[in-house]
Amino acid sequence: MHGVKHTAAGRLLVFNCHEAWVHQLEGIGHELDIVVGLPGRAVATWDERMRPVPAGARLLSLDEALSSRTQYAALVLHSVTDLLDAKALDGPKVIVIHNTLEGRVADQEAADDAPRLAETLKQFLSLTSVRAVAVSALKARSWGVGDEILPFGVDPDAYLPHSGVLARGIRVSNQFNRRRNILLVDLHEQAFSELPMTLVGHNSDIQGSGPARDWAHLKELLSTHRFYVHTADPQLEDGYNMASLEAMASGLPVLGNVHPSSPIVNGKSGFLSNDPEQLRRYAEQLLGDPELAARLGAEAKRVVTARFHVRAFRAGFRQAIANAQKRHRKKAQRALGAR
């Protein structure tokens, strides 16, 4: 289907967290049933502005998933709510940890229930065969769980050659203002507010911001802009996200704050500083020197290819599924032996 080969390894039931992450599972060796229509989403179904529906995937509601008789190879979940919703479904389960508990508190989303959520998750993991996979070491430490750490990945061959013809910076972020603490929005604004910048994403409160029309449009935007911006509090969020890795795969240098997990080396693949005035000077330098931007961007692409290739993600997630299946079988055998 569309050039993607699937084995007869069984289907995965995947709760949709966000399309860019789920799309990585295309080509993993399992066809996908994707649960859409979950609360807290910008759209009620799969958002094709983010990614096309993975080849061979079927979209279904939570009720349809709960009533399905399909024997899934594994269930892929992303929150305590997902775990509760899928409690009645038997099968190997993997929960993917995408955020920090501290970030939930900083965003004022769930300051009161963060400790309860962490305890609930730990109880689930101790009493069931659910296996936890964190997208980074920071996220694993925050929740105190994580059987495996599996960063997301990108396919550099999927992106356009970088032209950088627009003397503008670009950033991709949804609900940017609501995540001011996590994303160091004050630093971003102090450094870049007077410079030509494009903010891509669902941000109805920010004039001029909007989502890309589709993935092809996002690739075009990345290809034509001069540099990418990623700022994040080191205590709350990683020094990269999927969008910044996409930018690196597109050959853009990245500007941001100093961060222990940033893949950027200052002066080689981008520029890092906690001083907004210095970040502004770096940005102005790149806006005025497309050759420098191209040189740093080429190194950024080399780094992301070596460290974050989607092949490594898919191999790692196949292993996570196998480990979840093994744990589920052992749990079932112990239950039978106790009868």
Give names to the regions the model predicted.
Residues 81-181:
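Catalytic core of nucleotide-activated saccharide and alditol-phosphate transferases
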Residues 288-329:
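A charged, aromatic-enriched C-terminal amphipathic alpha-helix characteristic of glycosyltransferases
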Residues 18-21, 33-128:
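Extended catalytic core of nucleotide-activated donor transferases of GT-like folds
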Residues 266-277, 285-291:
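Conserved acidic donor-binding segment of nucleotide-sugar-dependent glycosyltransferases
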Residues 223-237, 252:
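Acidic donor-binding loop of glycosyltransferase active sites
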Residues 34, 142-145, 153-218:
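Conserved catalytic-core segment of nucleotide-activated headgroup transferases in glycan assembly
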Residues 249-256:
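Short hydrophobic beta-strand element within catalytic cores of glycosyltransferases
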